[in-house]
Amino acid sequence: MTQDPGETPAGTAGAATADLTLDAEVAAADVPPAIIAQSLGQYLRASWLRVRSGNSGVLPVVLAIVIVAVVFEILTPEHAFLRPSNLVFIFGLSTVYMVLAIAETAVLLLAEVDLSVGAVALIGGVIAFKLVQQPGANWPWWLALLAALVICGAIGAAQGALTAILRIPSFVVSLGGFLLFSGILIVVLGGADASVNLSTSMTNQRIIYDMVQGLISPVVAWIVLAVLVVAYGASQWLRTTSRRRQGLTAPPLSLIAIRIALVAIIGAAVVIICSVNRGSALKAVTGVPWVIPIVLVVLGGWTVLLQRTHFGRYVYAIGGNPEAARRAGVSVPAIRIWAFALCSATAALGGILLGSFFFGEYSTNTADPGQLVLYSIAAAVIGGVSLFGGRGKAIHGILGGLLIGSIAYGVSLLSLGSLSTPLEYILPGAVLLAAVLIDVLSRRGSGGVNRV
């Protein structure tokens, strides 16, 4: 039988139909490309369609990190920005912003904001440092950490209740909280000129000190990395095969393999960088800072909470359309209160890491709570979390925090004298405005649909 010249060849009909279906699903529904696509080619096509529709994901912040690294490497004296010692320092500095950005993400997803996160973080750090002091309370380090998280979580819950139950705008509540807790911070410290210092000779205090300053030996780091990569690969593989057995759509296996390889490459790069001697020939300093696995635990916990639990789905639903979520039976006030509580508890951990980063010392000069909250919001939004709610992930806070830390340290390396301090504000501010502009334009281009 002769085929009509205008007829689609039988061999390509299925592929053409699949591509058209893919385009329609990506354009009409907010479904991750990994779920829609049945092959690596379709995944790349779907991802590109999402970028064109305004949902660029982590692409802008990843490109920004690369550009910042290249620019500072060129501009810094002796091209020192990408030296292993400086990269490890950036890791340590950025982890504070990462944790605070993840904390802020919890409320930004609800289209709310917490301006007190910086002051609450510092209070959490001071509480933990005070409780392990000897003489003093001399609590076990783990109990001191738990107490700081619980106290700060209660602070967040109280602010969340004012917002959720009394309908006071979160901006007003948290701004009042920022001023209130900034004053309480001075009281907890013991005065404007007081300070709290950890002793490295006492095990109970040394553990908190080592959260940022402590190092994991390269050998142990390689073993841990291998275990993590295998565990991650196994979880991805089992989840994919389980979905296929149930007749559900699942990411193509080639994409799973690429993800596993990417995690392994990034992890290996970090271990290699941290294994380079950052000290001297007489006193070598090598190893992965403890804070890196700590932040990975925070990232993993928040990712599971937001992506794999009813609480996370409710958060996205409320951020996208609170009235629709309420009509669907979601307890909107309860979710808001929990989000603020978890935000403040996570911020407390960031405050503890900040004190450890400054070699176990806390004073009124350790950090400016106003700068901390601005950097935390900037890191979250720059990373890809929407100020309008309903869109963002914990990983966005990680990437945004890394970018903020890179800019802050890069400016200090330029040795610009009196210009250094202004640039530490100007550059993140410019990047933040660009991120918000991209967010606004993407929403206009997509008809205002919230996408996760």
Regions from the language model: what does each represent?
Residues 78-86, 186, 190-192, 274-292, ...:
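Inter-helical junctions in multi-pass inner-membrane proteins, predominant
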Residues 137-179, 400, 404:
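Alpha-helical transmembrane segments within multi-pass membrane transporters and channels
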Residues 236-253, 301-340:
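Membrane-helix/interface signature in polytopic inner-membrane proteins
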Residues 141, 170, 197-202, 217-227, ...:
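Loop-to-transmembrane alpha-helix initiation sites
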